[in-house]
Amino acid sequence: MLTLDTLNTMLAVSEEGMVEEMILALLASPQLVIFFEKFPRLKNAVTADLPRWREALRSRLKDARVPPELTEEVMCYQQSQLLSTPQFIVQLPQILALLHRLHSPYAAQAKQLTESNSTFTPALHTLFLQRWRLSLVVQATTLNQQLLEEEREQLLSDVQERMTLSGQLEPTLAENDNAAGRLWDMSAGQLKRGDYQLIVKYGEFLAAQPELMQLAEQLGRSREAKSVPKKDAPMETFRTLVREPATVPEQVDGIQQGDDILRLLPPELATLGITELEYEFYRRLVEKQLLTYRLHGEAWREKVTERPVVHQDVDEQPRGPFIVCVDTSGSMGGFNEQCAKAFCLALMRVALADNRRCFIMLFSTDVVRYELSGPESIEQAIRFLSQRFRGGTDIASCFRAIIERMQGREWFDADAVVISDFIAQRLPDDVVSKVGELQRLHQHRFHAVAMSAHGKPGIMRIFDHIWRFDTGMRSRLLRRWRR
């Protein structure tokens, strides 16, 4: 069967203009205009999606099939072009019958041309074919427009659903234009209103806990630039100011070794008067090893030393992925659970803004994993927020899962974040040793977000940074009072 793309090529019908006209009509629709005014950050994200829309429309037109009636008429037209005028006159009754049978828009006009001219001349033959071709072009254009109109309605429906989803989640997850673009891409999934309302709910909870949001932003952007030493690094001059006793005799502050004759201790002067020790005295004088009085003062001088250059290869503000481990034990239920989930949502916001990955692992007696920065991030976030914290505490398995994840090439610069009350058993020595190796050799950072003031110091000693957010009633009341 004839495709619409082939028909457009045969009749020299350009679909590009129709596609562009449809895109402009879609962008000018009242729904999109109001949406862009309300969420200006998402306007760039939608605009960036236009090439994909154009490609989808072209693909739809290219793959569309021409109706059988129009296909038969086009084939008849092509065959008629090859006939001479005498041959065409012989075939004319069959052509008119075919047009009538196919209910062609050109059938009535073709019959009128034939009946109004008693002699069928070559000029009339050319005019017949030209008008027939014009009728086919009109039919092809109409077919293109019908398909584009169907696609426009479908595209507008999809865009409205994505706009509703993105508009609801934009205050929670979109910090900048980059985050808005990624949020728009993630909104392409099939989600119902009741699903993403869970994210909106925790977003409202996060807005009511500004200290929690501030803590997430500080943690997410806390990593400093690191210096990477080079082999055979050149030496550089290093100047420092050092304080040493002044030469002005203000106050005796002790004794020291030196060659100041005026400050010599009496026993040292006594050796000068002994013949056997005279050469020993001069030797110690030359080597500045004579005991002298040390005078107290506030004199400063510049000390010049040399050291290897260690700041040549600087990795400025590395933006690695997050590996977040959340304690789902029973002690983390209630308000702790709400804070932990909201904190992960805040880290997801930071990851979207900085174009980083955010990987969540829930640990109790087992480890459950969620990817919050991939194409299905919204679905994954909803599943994570739907979890209930009712398990036990196995923090060792959490660290082993982190260590295993950091062995991969794509996680070589990851930051680990452990959210817990840290009321658990001590860590095995092999885990502590492996974490220390990752910190020392690969510059991995391990952050602790402590939800309790009663965490075990033996466990928390392993972390580079400890961020405290006490969820006790007293701390909650103090935070509310400070606001």
Curated annotation (Swiss-Prot):
Gene3D superfamilies: von Willebrand factor, type A domain (3.40.50.410)
Disulfide bond positions: none
Entry keyword annotation includes Chaperone: yes
SMART domains: VWA (SM00327)
Keywords: Chaperone, Cytoplasm
Source organism superkingdom: Bacteria
Family the UniProt entry places it in: Belongs to the ViaA family.
HAMAP family: ViaA
Assembly notes: Homodimer. Interacts with RavA.
Protein name as annotated: Regulatory protein ViaA
Organism for this UniProt entry: Salmonella typhi
